């Protein structure tokens, strides 16, 4: 597991700025502390942790038994825009000495605060690796700009949701350095015990308060519109006073505008009002219980849209500060909280409800994933970041490497019978190809793949080909993000839950991509074939089985569980023959090579296959090609079987046309030319008139699986990795 390039421990510096980010960083810190054989932990505390007005929250870090290596007073008081800028500058002045003394291998920073921006800037300029927690999220304020700026400085990213992961990818961050882990606070939140919650409620809200009969209010200034956010806070307090329920009010973050918000609280007498409890800080484990058993939470804190959903507690989200975040159904947005009546109406609608619990932001297992991710960091890798930019128009200028070497990929095709490895050039030329029988066991197969790839890589040097990576096409269902074969076809034994990426990458020291053969056929058409330049098309590959791939808006569709484009298992008959998938009536049960072989054997056993001009040697197995030969020589029964097979395939294509409405359907594989005319006839007879003009063509690619495997590598390099 260790990849840090030497035998010493990884020195990790965790820097925390305020009570909110500590709730996310503390679970990671506890996790690091439990593995002293792998990690050394340094803790740096700065920002509002060290300010009395905000509760001196550094004390809770000490209470958690963490040694604080450094305390940095970095907040310039004033709570306005200029003070925030000066605070960043003060942190930038102080941090270099600290980082020079600690010499961390990696610094962990969280979120979107201006303090975190100072930390990331310092570490980046001092060539210290940065792990950013909760990047890629969208809220809707200046926080977005700060968060995304930290993302560009950070070398590694831990995100909480699939959407955040996609945002990071769209920001051109290196895919291999992004971890979808979930929110670390959920590890503690989802395991919280409820038995003492009443004592916590009484401690903070009074002895007479019952569960679900109080409100938690947490509102911060919006630094891009301070005047409006202060007015909204004033209206919120008026609505809460009118609603007449016991309310716990937490002081706002130390942002521009926070001082004015505190003045509003004091002007309205909130600190002395019998229905209010105003506090600077609540420990996170107690805060969890308070929001879990509240009748409602109101304000604009990220906690309301992130953590509170795990309990189904009603939330009223005021204004635009969190408007871009993913939320559960427990959140009621009041974007224009411009009247007391509107906020009061929201309180009446939400208070006391119980919503389904949602776990959008985590499953309680983030910390183990993060620790594993940390252990995998290779300190010998170049520090310079790589960005994956989208495809651009090819540069007409020349590169000396392109002249002296042929940029190429190693392509691997795992078929039911053969295992093939090829060197494929950027132009789609197969420079060299190796073929072996596919072994029956996992161990033999993986060893043969490694052996063939090593041999091909050595040959590539002699052929002046620079190998950029390895692409693998295999039958079955594949998780291309992880490079894992989830479930294989029955033709490839011992090939379920197989990690292909790791052994090849470790052996060849090259990036590795994996996908199934149907998807690879579509990728081959997109880069080298008749799908080049098309926005939408579908490929059907006919061979031993039936597969396919769907290109939509120039991108390959994988589906939520990587099961998209299993086109061979479209059902075209309710009472058709059994299929290898366990169902019946699938296209594959009619039109695949296996299906034709089955029918050929039946005819042969009944002495109805052979016609004049045909013979089958005794040592040769009867197969699909014999059936096709018999049909060509006039065997009516063989012709009928092929017609039925082509009709089944044609009905599948009709269903695809009605579902996807692609601009082109490409039939690929050894049987495509035998089916094309029947498929077109079925479309004319069965399809809606509006899709009958869609082109259906036979692929002109000789090795679509190999070319598609290569295209995964070659497409990636054209994204201009820097």
Swiss-Prot record:
InterPro entries noted in UniProt: ATPase_NBD, ROK, UDP-GlcNAc_Epase, UDP_GlcNAc_Epimerase_2_dom
Stated consequence of mutating residue 519 to S: In NM and THC12; likely pathogenic; decreased UDP-N-acetylglucosamine 2-epimerase activity; decreased N-acylmannosamine kinase activity
Documented activity regulation: The UDP-N-acetylglucosamine 2-epimerase activity, in contrast to the N-acetylmannosamine kinase activity, exhibits allosteric regulation by cytidine monophosphate-N-acetylneuraminic acid (CMP-Neu5Ac), the end product of neuraminic acid biosynthesis. Moreover, the activity is contingent upon the oligomeric state of the enzyme. The monomeric form is inactive, while the dimeric form selectively catalyzes the phosphorylation of N-acetylmannosamine. The hexameric form, on the other hand, demonstrates full proficiency in both enzyme activities.
Post-translational modification: Phosphorylated. Phosphorylation by PKC activates the UDP-N-acetylglucosamine 2-epimerase activity.
Pathway: Amino-sugar metabolism; N-acetylneuraminate biosynthesis
Chain positions recorded as CMP-N-acetyl-beta-neuraminate binding sites: 259, 271, 280-281
SUPFAM superfamilies on file: Actin-like ATPase domain (SSF53067), UDP-Glycosyltransferase/glycogen phosphorylase (SSF53756)
Tissue: Highest expression in liver and placenta. Also found in heart, brain, lung, kidney, skeletal muscle and pancreas. Isoform 1 is expressed in heart, brain, kidney, liver, placenta, lung, spleen, pancreas, skeletal muscle and colon. Isoform 2 is expressed mainly in placenta, but also in brain, kidney, liver, lung, pancreas and colon. Isoform 3 is expressed at low level in kidney, liver, placenta and colon.
Compartments in which it is found: Cytoplasm, Cytosol
EC number: 3.2.1.183, 2.7.1.60
Effect of residue 266 to Q: In SIALURIA; abolishes feedback inhibition by CMP-Neu5Ac
Binding site for Mg(2+): 413
Catalytic activity: UDP-N-acetyl-alpha-D-glucosamine + H2O = aldehydo-N-acetyl-D-mannosamine + UDP + H(+); an N-acyl-D-mannosamine + ATP = an N-acyl-D-mannosamine 6-phosphate + ADP + H(+)
Main subcellular location: cytoplasm
Chain sites annotated for binding an N-acyl-D-mannosamine: 476-477, 489, 516-517, 566, 569, 588
Summary of subunit composition and partner proteins: Homodimer. Homotetramer. Homohexamer. The hexameric form exhibits both enzyme activities, whereas the dimeric form only catalyzes the phosphorylation of N-acyl-D-mannosamine.
Similarity comment: family membership: In the N-terminal section; belongs to the UDP-N-acetylglucosamine 2-epimerase family.
Protein name as catalogued: Bifunctional UDP-N-acetylglucosamine 2-epimerase/N-acetylmannosamine kinase
Gene designation: GNE
